[in-house]
């Protein structure tokens, strides 16, 4: 493993710098972007100076579709519906790992981890309209 680490570090000119291994929590200031329980949404970021590569990871977590399923989900999987207990930092594992032995291809990338807390399968909240039909070309 020491050989893998040495090889990976030699590929990056800034690898001799002290690397930050923790992803830091950033809470969004836009009050319309919230988790199921109304707590603010956010993301974790680990910047790697000198790297132009970015890895953005959207956490999975299924969904709820009624008051009953959402209440049940809140009792059993609260972390997927609220940011209230998110820690201020996280350490990535697997593809998010900052360790070259564990993640030889992406260890030095800028990393963004977006926790899933809205139970909407990342679909957002676009308002419904009464408009039907094909819009066609705009030119």
Swiss-Prot record:
Coiled coil: none annotated. InterPro entries: PAE/NOTUM (IPR004963). GO terms for molecular function: palmitoleyl hydrolase activity. GO terms for biological process: negative regulation of Wnt signaling pathway; protein depalmitoleylation. Pfam families: PAE (PF03283). PANTHER family: NOTUM-RELATED, PALMITOLEOYL-PROTEIN CARBOXYLESTERASE NOTUM. Probable inactive palmitoleoyl-protein carboxylesterase. Belongs to the pectinacetylesterase family. Notum subfamily. This is Inactive palmitoleoyl-protein carboxylesterase notum1b.
């Amino acid at each position: 493993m020491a050989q893998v680490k040495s090889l990976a570090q030699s590929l990056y000119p800034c690898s001799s710098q002290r690397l930050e291994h923790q992803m830091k929590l950033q809470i969004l200031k836009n009050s319309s972007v919230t988790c199921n329980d109304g707590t603010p949404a956010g993301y974790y970021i680990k910047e790697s100076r000198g790297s132009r590569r970015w890895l953005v990871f959207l956490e999975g977590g299924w969904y709820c579709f009624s008051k009953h399923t959402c209440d049940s989900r809140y009792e059993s999987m609260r972390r997927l519906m609220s940011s209230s207990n998110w820690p201020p930092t996280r350490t990535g594992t697997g593809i998010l790992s900052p360790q070259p032995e564990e993640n030889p291809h992406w260890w030095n990338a800028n990393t963004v981890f977006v926790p899933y807390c809205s139970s909407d399968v990342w679909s957002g909240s676009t308002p419904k309209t009464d408009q039907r039909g094909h819009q066609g070309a705009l030119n």
